[in-house]
Each structure stands twice: as C-alpha cells, then as structure tokens.
Swiss-Prot record:
Lineage: Bacteria, Bacillati, Actinomycetota, Actinomycetes, Mycobacteriales
Enzyme class, UniProt record, top EC level: lyase
Family statement drawn from the similarity comment of this UniProt entry: Belongs to the nitrile hydratase subunit alpha family.
Species per Swiss-Prot/TrEMBL record: Rhodococcus rhodochrous
Catalytic activity: an aliphatic primary amide = an aliphatic nitrile + H2O
Binding-site positions, Co(3+): 102, 105-107
Quaternary assembly: Heterodimer of an alpha and a beta chain.
Summary of the function given for this chain in its UniProt record: NHase catalyzes the hydration of various nitrile compounds to the corresponding amides.
Co-factor requirement: Co(3+)
Record-linked InterPro entries: CN_Hdrase_a/SCN_Hdrase_g_sf (IPR036648), CN_Hdrtase_a/SCN_Hdrlase_g (IPR004232), CN_Hdrtase_asu/SCN_Hdrlase_gsu (IPR023900), Nitrile_hydratase_asu (IPR018141)
Alphabetical UniProt keywords: Cobalt, Lyase, Metal-binding
Biotechnology annotation for this entry: Industrial production of acrylamide is now being developed using some of these enzymes.
Listed name of the protein: High-molecular weight cobalt-containing nitrile hydratase subunit alpha
Keyword hit for Cell inner membrane: no
Amino acid sequence: MSEHVNKYTEYEARTKAIETLLYERGLITPAAVDRVVSYYENEIGPMGGAKVVAKSWVDPEYRKWLEEDATAAMASLGYAGEQAHQISAVFNDSQTHHVVVCTLCSCYPWPVLGLPPAWYKSMEYRSRVVADPRGVLKRDFGFDIPDEVEVRVWDSSSEIRYIVIPERPAGTDGWSEEELTKLVSRDSMIGVSNALTPQEVIV
C-alpha cells in the first residue's frame, strides 16, 4: 500500500486548486500565468529597488526626495502601480536598523521588490519578528545586529508599504550606480541583511 505525500504547503495547495479551477473553466491559461510570473521575476523584481537604493547613495537630492516622498521619487524612475500607491523609505544608519513585516497578510511593494519570498508570507516570520526582531534576524538569517544598534520593525499594510534603504558599504567610493546595484539584495531592502560588501561581489 502506497502512502500519498502532499508536497505543497496549505497556501500552495489552495493556490493550485484555484489555479486548476480557473484553467478548467477557461478563464486563464498556463501560458498567461507563466507570463505574469516571468514579468514579476524578470521585468520588475528586486532590481528596481536596487536601482532606487543605488541612486540614493550617489545623488543627495534624490535621497532627500526619497525621504520626503518615496512614492513620487520611485515613480520618477518608473516604479509605480497598485502595490506601490503609497511607499515609505526607511534608512539604515550606524545607530538604527530597520526591518519590514506584514503582520496581517503579506503586503509588499511588488513594483520595486518583485515577488515576496515565501518566508515573508509565513505566519512564523510575521508573528515572531515583531516580538523578537533581533532574535529572528540572528536565528533565521544569520544576521547579528550589534547591541548598540536599535532595531525598528515596520508593519506594512494595504495603506502603506515600506522599503529599507541599507547603508552604503565601505570601499565603494567612485563606483557607478550600475556597479552599486549589484550590492543591493532583496533581503537588504526588507531588512533581514545588510547590502553586500565589495568583497562579496564581482563588479
């Protein structure tokens, strides 16, 4: 007797069931779904956010605009849409580190960060990072924040999304915006890591 093993999580199983039903009723096609996924992974994706961060590192006027009105500043670079109708940028520095969560569901600035990672949507992350952000960053991401640095948690919602602007790594003086984007990861813009160092990438 063989035993059936469900390889999907609860949310994945629900999504698959809905997707199958829509296919059967002819409301969508697999090709259409593939195009949407490819668009968010390749055309939008976290590279948009990386360009915003890199520009803020080299352009003081843009950085100031980003601080005052991130939604408009990002829209000026072409990053706007339903999931970016109101975005606030929070800036890491030597005294403060920011981390983003959505405690109610998985609100996320898709136009600049692409598809949210599975862990961001998980109940475990959403509940634990609010109560113990420093512990979650260390245990789940191997990211140890020094005791003297304050950790602030920002709760995204349907009204407002957040993007973390990580500190510019040392040793990048003279780098172009294009080179700097390679240092900016999706995780650093959620706040579960720092930007990469020059030693961690090949420019």
